């Protein structure tokens, strides 16, 4: 048995190892006869030997007709395929894997594999290649890499441009009435709930989401102002105002100028509010002092007239006290005399004229003293 059949059956026979030289010297199979008709059905896979040439596919028969698929492929793909499938690229082993013996017969082999595995179309060369061919393959591969890198850069730039081209949102222009209502609501609560936002939307005729965005921006502005004036803007302004009042320092012109647009729009609204209140309080105090000064002369004149018209009524407290003490003593003496007279049983004698006059004077003094006490009460 000679040829491929002998080489295929040689490993199965015991005690007869296959020499490498025999496999290398085996002639290629004869070409088919000109008169033979090709079989219409699929050809079963042929058993090949395990020699070096069979494994590498060097004994493959050339195709009987030229393939047109090679012309349809672009030049860049062919150059890249030649550089990959060349012995310098894969070490001369790739053709055996892509050859007819490397793929089983029950798999449909693609046309581009057959074209690329054809040694005549790819023009495989031995390891020693000409320097001109190496340069051309390297330049072709570098050109293809440059094209792919440029395509990637273009795709990245287009993606970045599409990201940057965002839809511009419509900017809401608030009226003075809307701003005033929003500021009032912000002073009441920095974080209004959904119900408060809906009520504010009905009042200002603004959408609820616009009101929510406005409150977010207003809170950010408020935090920025807090950082500018300290941890708490109200306490910082209060301390500043106290120091200015204590040392009689006037307000800076910048704060006064910012108050022209409105207290809430100024850089220190609480400080300006306190300054305004202090000015109003000072003006009210000045008015009260002027009214009191105008009323004081009238009171002085009235007192003088009253004192001048009735000088007898101007009695000191000491005189009243002395009169009251004397009246009490007189009453005590009368009581004592009456008691003594009743005890002794003596008939009361008639008083003389001098004694009657003295008693009358005492009674008049008592009556006058009682009248004075009533007036004082």
Swiss-Prot record:
Pfam families associated with the record: Homeodomain (PF00046), OAR (PF03826)
InterPro entries, A to Z: CVC (IPR023339), HD (IPR001356), Homeobox_CS (IPR017970), Homeodomain-like_sf (IPR009057), OAR_dom (IPR003654), VSX_homeobox_regulators (IPR052294)
Domain (CVC): residue spans on this chain: 227-280
Disulfide bonds: none
A GO-annotated cellular component: nucleus
Gene3D superfamilies per the UniProt record, alphabetical: Homeodomain-like
Keywords of the record: Activator, Developmental protein, DNA-binding, Homeobox, Nucleus, Repressor, Sensory transduction, Transcription, Transcription regulation, Vision
Motif OAR: where in chain: 323-336
Listed Basic and acidic residues bias regions: 285-310, 347-377
GO molecular function: DNA-binding transcription repressor activity, RNA polymerase II-specific; RNA polymerase II transcription regulatory region sequence-specific DNA binding; transcription cis-regulatory region binding
Main location: nucleus
Xref: CDD domains: homeodomain
Region (Disordered): 1-50, 129-170, 285-377
Gene Ontology BP annotations: cell fate commitment; central nervous system neuron differentiation; negative regulation of neuroblast proliferation; neuroblast proliferation; positive regulation of cell population proliferation; positive regulation of transcription by RNA polymerase II; regulation of DNA-templated transcription; retinal bipolar neuron differentiation
Tissue specificity statement from the Swiss-Prot or TrEMBL entry: Retina and spinal cord.
Compartmental location: Nucleus
Function: Acts as a transcriptional regulator. Plays a significant role in the specification and morphogenesis of the sensory retina. Mediates differentiation of V2a interneurons by repression of motor neuron gene transcription, via competitively binding to response elements that are activated by the ISL1-LHX3 complex. May also participate in the development of the cells of the inner nuclear layer, particularly bipolar cells.
Name this polypeptide is given: Visual system homeobox 2
Record organism: Gallus gallus (Chicken)
């Amino acid at each position: 048995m000679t040829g491929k059949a002998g080489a295929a059956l040689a490993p199965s026979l015991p005690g007869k190892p296959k020499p490498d030289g025999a496999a290398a010297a085996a002639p290629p199979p004869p070409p088919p006869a000109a008169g033979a008709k090709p079989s219409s059905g699929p050809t079963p896979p042929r058993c090949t030997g395990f020699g070096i040439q069979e494994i590498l596919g060097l004994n493959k028969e050339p195709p009987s007709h030229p393939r047109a698929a090679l012309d349809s492929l672009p030049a860049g793909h062919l150059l890249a395929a030649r550089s990959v499938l060349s012995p310098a690229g894969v070490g001369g082993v790739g053709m055996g894997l892509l050859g007819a013996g490397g793929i089983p017969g029950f798999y449909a082999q693609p046309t581009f594999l057959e074209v690329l595995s054809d040694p005549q179309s790819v023009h495989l060369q031995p390891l020693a290649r000409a320097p001109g061919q190496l340069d051309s393959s390297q330049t072709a591969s570098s050109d293809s890499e440059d094209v792919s890198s440029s395509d990637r850069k273009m795709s990245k730039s287009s993606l970045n441009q599409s990201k940057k081209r965002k839809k511009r949102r419509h900017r809401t222009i608030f009226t003075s009435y809307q701003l005033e209502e929003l500021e009032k609501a912000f002073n009441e609560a920095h974080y209004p709930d959904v119900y408060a936002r809906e009520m504010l939307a009905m009042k200002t005729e603004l959408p609820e989401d616009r009101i929510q965005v406005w409150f977010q921006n207003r809170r950010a502005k408020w935090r920025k102002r807090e950082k500018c004036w300290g941890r708490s803007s109200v306490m910082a302004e209060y301390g500043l105002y106290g120091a200015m009042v204590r040392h009689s320092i006037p307000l800076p012109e910048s704060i006064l100028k910012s108050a022209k647009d409105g207290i809430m729009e100024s850089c220190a609204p609480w400080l300006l509010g306190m300054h305004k209140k202090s000015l109003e309080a000072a003006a009210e105090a000045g008015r009260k002092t002027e009214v009191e000064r105008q009323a004081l002369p009238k009171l002085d004149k009235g007192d003088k007239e009253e004192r001048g018209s009735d000088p007898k009524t101007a009695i000191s407290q000491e005189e009243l006290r002395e009169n009251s003490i004397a009246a009490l003593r007189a009453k005590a003496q009368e009581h004592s005399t009456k008691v003594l007279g009743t005890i002794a049983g003596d008939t009361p004698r008639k008083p003389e004229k001098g004694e009657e006059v003295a008693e009358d004077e005492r009674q008049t003094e008592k009556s006058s003293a009682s009248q004075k006490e009533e007036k004082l009460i």
